[in-house]
Amino acid sequence: MNKPVFIALDFPNLKTAFDFLNKFPSHEKPAVKVGMELFYAEGPKIIQQLRQKGYKVFLDLKLYDIPHTVAAAVRSLLALDVQYLTIHSLGGLKMMEAAVDAAEGKIKLLAVTQLTSISANEMRGTQLTSATIEQSVKHLTQLALLAGVDGTISSPLEANIIKQITPDDFLKITPGIRLFNDQNGDQIRITTPKKAKEFGASGLVVGRSITQAADPLSVYRKILEEFE
């Protein structure tokens, strides 16, 4: 998984998630992302079943609480044997450090910076800052790096900024990936797999472009080809 492409399993339940995954041949299991919708609906059993079937799992819960609580949550989630887990960088340096200590190197921790759905104006108003999105992502990445996390989540448009200030092995995972003929949905800061690669992304998260396609396998293969 040098340059993983995660399919976001944004489905309401286990059955619809596996109905989708069964469209892929058994020898071509994609890496998958499980977010709040599916995890909160099904609980740990969705992760357990995915792992039993050989899927590599990225658990996207964006943990954001006081350091003690986040550390305890990370320790609990280690039992699920997922490969990646998200925390939110806005929780601060101490929270991220606590998560890193709790992970004990057994899981890749990814710090979410700014959501791909947020605009510059909304970020400034909500977070009461005069910074640009690029400045904010750079600052949050520097904190994440200081805390010892394994990588960040940002829009592909900020991947190059992150690449410039982090080591080569620091993961730069980018959602907000669309093909040229796709609708943006609720994401604002988006680009294509090819452009994300040019910007320096080391991994992609792709949801609706694949899950809502008439031929998901072909679209998945096309994205892999563009990104490799």
From Swiss-Prot:
Residues that hold substrate according to the record: 10, 33, 60-69, 116, 178, 187, 207-208
Keyword Signal carried by entry: no
GO molecular function, one term: orotidine-5'-phosphate decarboxylase activity
One Pfam family linked to the record: OMPdecase
GO process annotations (BP): 'de novo' pyrimidine nucleobase biosynthetic process; 'de novo' UMP biosynthetic process
Catalytic activity: orotidine 5'-phosphate + H(+) = UMP + CO2
Residues at the catalytic site: K62 (proton donor)
Cellular component GO terms held in the UniProt record: cytosol
Enzyme Commission code: 4.1.1.23
Keywords noted in UniProt: Decarboxylase, Lyase, Pyrimidine biosynthesis
Matches recorded under InterPro entries: Aldolase_TIM (IPR013785), OMPdecase (IPR014732), OMPdecase_AS (IPR018089), OMPdecase_bac (IPR047596), OMPdeCOase_dom (IPR001754), RibuloseP-bd_barrel (IPR011060)
Superkingdom, taxonomy of origin: Bacteria
Family: Belongs to the OMP decarboxylase family. Type 1 subfamily.
HAMAP family in the record: OMPdecase_type1_B (MF_01200_B)
Classification via PANTHER family: OROTIDINE 5'-PHOSPHATE DECARBOXYLASE
Oligomer and partners: Homodimer.
Function: Catalyzes the decarboxylation of orotidine 5'-monophosphate (OMP) to uridine 5'-monophosphate (UMP).
Protein name: Orotidine 5'-phosphate decarboxylase
GN (gene name): pyrF
